[in-house]
């Protein structure tokens, strides 16, 4: 569990894979007065995850829209996206 999820309420997690390899994990956490999307990105040829962000939004609706657009883009690029 991420540090943010320990103090907020985790809304959802989306895990994208391509050719069986993890590409990214997106996690939305609601803090009541804001919502944060955390990202772990797994670059090709690297064992280590990169953690851009976090991305802070006014509410869960905005955070969900952001993740929805990211998921649609990942699917367009040939990734399989799963809810966790």
Language model features: what each stretch is:
Residues 1-21, 46-49, 58, 84:
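Negatively charged, low-complexity tracts enriched in Asp/Glu with abundant Ser/Thr
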Residues 2, 9, 20-29, 64, ...:
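Short, mixed-charge low-complexity intrinsically disordered segments
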Residues 11-12, 26, 37, 70:
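Generic hydrophobic, helix-prone segments enriched in Leu/Val/Ile
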Residues 24-53:
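Short aromatic-glycine-(Arg/Gly/Cys) micro-motifs in beta-strand/loop hairpins
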Residues 33-35, 57, 79:
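Broad hydrophobic/π-residue packing in well-ordered secondary structure
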Residues 41-42, 54-56, 69, 82-84:
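Short, charged/polar low-complexity linear motifs in solvent-exposed/disordered segments
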Residues 47, 58-76:
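A short, charged, amphipathic alpha-helix used as a generic interaction element across diverse proteins
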């Amino acid at each position: 569990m991420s540090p943010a999820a320990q103090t907020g309420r985790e809304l959802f997690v989306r895990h994208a894979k391509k050719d069986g390899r993890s590409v990214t994990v997106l996690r939305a956490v609601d803090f009541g007065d804001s919502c944060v999307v955390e990202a772990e990105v797994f670059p090709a040829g690297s064992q280590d995850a990169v953690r851009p962000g976090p991305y802070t939004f006014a509410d869960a609706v905005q955070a969900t829209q952001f993740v929805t657009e990211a998921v649609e883009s990942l699917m367009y690029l040939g990734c399989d996206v799963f809810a966790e």
